[in-house]
From Swiss-Prot:
Required for the assembly and/or stability of the 40S ribosomal subunit. Required for the processing of the 20S rRNA-precursor to mature 18S rRNA in a late step of the maturation of 40S ribosomal subunits. The keyword Membrane does not apply. GO terms for biological process: ribosomal small subunit assembly; translation. This is Small ribosomal subunit protein uS2. Disulfide bonds: none annotated. The gene is rps0. InterPro entries: Ribosomal_uS2, Ribosomal_uS2_C, Ribosomal_uS2_CS, Ribosomal_uS2_euk, Ribosomal_uS2_euk/arc, Ribosomal_uS2_flav_dom_sf. It is found in: Cytoplasm. PANTHER family: 40S RIBOSOMAL PROTEIN SA. Keywords: Cytoplasm, Ribonucleoprotein, Ribosomal protein. HAMAP family: Ribosomal_S2_euk. One of its GO terms (molecular function) is structural constituent of ribosome.
Amino acid sequence: MAPSNLPPVFNATSQDIEMLLAAQCHLGSKNLQVHMEPYLWKTRPDGINVINIGKTWEKIVLAARIIAAIDNPADVAVISARPYGQRAVLKFASHTGATAIAGRFTPGNFTNYITRSFKEPRLIIVTDPRTDAQAIKEASYVNIPVIALCDTDSPTEFVDVAIPTNNKGRHAIGLVWWLLAREVLRLRGTLATRETEWDVVVDLYFYRDPEAEETKEIADETKVAGAEEVGPAAIESGYVGDSWDAAAPGAAAPGAAFAAASATAGATWEAEASGDWAAESAQPNPETKW
């Protein structure tokens, strides 16, 4: 599924297309914004709008070329108020040198020069035009170009480059940011050739729930020893394999020990019982004198 509007060198590989499909980047919402119609491929019977993956790749390459054209990487601001995109923008910033704004966008970041967090970027990239509306609005006041990850129902007002994709799933958001970072590094020459594999795995860009990770660690620590952990312990204690009848080294056989003990006990009982009980009972008790 190679886009026809790109030079052959920029065409997506089959692996890139498979990753976009596996992350469900092509699944939009049931609502359709009029400006997103050119990126629509079809509408499923259940009402889900399907995005054209070829258009998604074209816009990723276009956005990467815009980012690579900026001399100072720190002049690019990547923004995500949506939790699923915060880890992705932080990783993108660390790999490309951009400035990350993860979490709540403080009003006045681009317009109020008195605030400590005042910034003057030359380009901003947002994860969702709806949740990052404040950043887009302020960028329009100071003439900052905007690149946005847009779903089929996303508002495109003041958005200069829209990357059509699913911007609600954590895998879709992480994958698009990862592809964008890889393409920027290719254009800058950090990656020698387009055939060179990037050693950063896409999983680093995916959102991870801290509470779920903590619960998993606690479960691993309190894990009860399984059957596979009993075997080595039994071998170390002197028992070989699963045979419970085998004696430990230096110990006598259980049957022989029981027979010897029984023989000794029988001889002793017979010796004690040889006395005359009648003679003992006939003896008168001595009188007690007070």
